[in-house]
């Protein structure tokens, strides 16, 4: 693992331990680091592209199922958007104050130290990132393959192979050049937004033609039971997840003090308005029974409205998944990169290609994890395990924001919010942590167990000083690192001291 001089290539290991990063390190390698190639437009597309996934096309019925009326469901969609704006604004302050990539991992590390940060990283490594990427890839594959089998279900193997090819292709694109990855993100974000605009325009035309029956007495039959409202809001917030995407790549943003909060400020209203108007469009054509009975609401909508052009929506869903998967790969690879740099993962993962300046090892590691999870037949079941963990660590990040306000009040903060925003958000995340514990207790407890399974690794590996680890183990790790350097043409990266902050102490000591 990385020691206290982890940002200097030649000092990571002693040569007599068989290190791959010993005396032979080139002086030039010390200058290799991730470049600032993400513009304001790229940032907006990353956030919008990750937030707008397949959910708004396929299953927006979760909110309607629990709210039981069109009127209340639209209110809950709006509340979910406002809540997400609060969270995104808090992350904008954190991202401009702690200018490290890694999002909540970096913020928890700064506020509370290495232990909680490692558990956050462990949960992402084991469940959150590979599971979500595998599910997105499978959804993409299903929408691409199913039209070839109109009268029966698509073969299982065909879907999984196409999903694997999708993960491999996007991993290669992001390994090649950062610009290629951002270009893919921009193009597919435009495509999915245009598809939703087409749905919205069709809905507006229908309303203009007098199709307003579903909006008369729109609150009739509403379920105001706290349990139902809680589950409806939870469904809406799941669709809004992804607003923290840009915080995973803070160190690669041009002028982050300006572009990070501005990207968030532009993206959040766009997504909220699109979600609201898309649901209005659905409600103008489909009644409650049709929506709840549909496996893919947008496809059912297109069958009734677009006629021979109804193929547009399945293609749009596939495009949406492709763009969302690309954003997820970018974010997850940076999380692994930062985790390695902070000493919580093997050194090899925080290396950067010497010519292309891309984090090739972390991208490959992330890709391999996702491919492994594709082999899990009931992969969708794994999603149920991480709802509790996800919101717990998001809330803990905002608690860290409040703690740093108290602990370090004089710290430079380019963006400083009123305490109203983080306090309200913290109170709401308590609710979001409690909901799955109440409604899905078994799966939530399994998720907690998965997070706690990282304890032995932390106390028996991470916290053990490197010189006390078995020599054979150090040599094995050094050999793997050496071969990865050769294979990936990569060297350990320096942190950008101009925009980042060196750890004041080793996270392993906390």
Swiss-Prot record:
It is a multi-pass membrane protein. It catalyses: L-leucine(out) + L-arginine(in) + Na(+)(out) = L-leucine(in) + L-arginine(out) + Na(+)(in); L-leucine(out) + L-lysine(in) + Na(+)(out) = L-leucine(in) + L-lysine(out) + Na(+)(in); L-leucine(out) + L-ornithine(in) + Na(+)(out) = L-leucine(in) + L-ornithine(out) + Na(+)(in). It is found in: Basolateral cell membrane. The chain crosses the membrane at residues 38-58, 70-90, 108-128, 134-154, 161-181, 187-207, 223-243, 260-280, 305-325, 384-404, 417-437, 442-462. Strongly expressed in kidney and intestine. Weaker expression observed in epididymis, testis, ovary, thyroid pancreas, sub-gland and liver. One of its GO terms (molecular function) is basic amino acid transmembrane transporter activity. It holds the Pfam family AA_permease_2. Glycans are attached at residues 3, 326. One of its GO terms (biological process) is L-arginine transmembrane transport. Keywords: Amino-acid transport, Cell membrane, Disulfide bond, Glycoprotein, Membrane, Phosphoprotein, Transmembrane, Transmembrane helix, Transport. InterPro entries: AA/rel_permease1, AminoAcid_Transporter. The keyword Glycoprotein applies. Disruption phenotype: A mouse model for human lysinuric protein intolerance (LPI), where homozygous knockout mice for Slc7a7 gene are born at a frequency lower than the expected Mendelian ratio. Only two homozygous mice survived, whereas 16 of them died within 24 hours of birth. Growth retardation is an ongoing feature of the two surviving mice kept on a low-protein diet with citrulline supplementation. The modification Phosphoserine is found at residues 19, 26. Its main location: membrane. Disulfide bonds: none annotated. One of its GO terms (cellular component) is basolateral plasma membrane. Signal peptide: none annotated. Belongs to the amino acid-polyamine-organocation (APC) superfamily. L-type amino acid transporter (LAT) (TC 2.A.3.8) family. Heterodimer with SLC3A2, that functions as an antiporter which operates as an efflux route by exporting cationic amino acids from inside the cells in exchange with neutral amino acids plus sodium ions and may participate in nitric oxide synthesis via the transport of L-arginine. Also mediates L-arginine transport in non-polarized cells, such as monocytes, and is essential for the correct function of these cells. The transport mechanism is electroneutral and operates with a stoichiometry of 1:1. In vitro, Na(+) and Li(+), but also H(+), are cotransported with the neutral amino acids. Disulfide-linked heterodimer with the amino acid transport protein SLC3A2/4F2hc. This is Y+L amino acid transporter 1. It comes from Mus musculus.
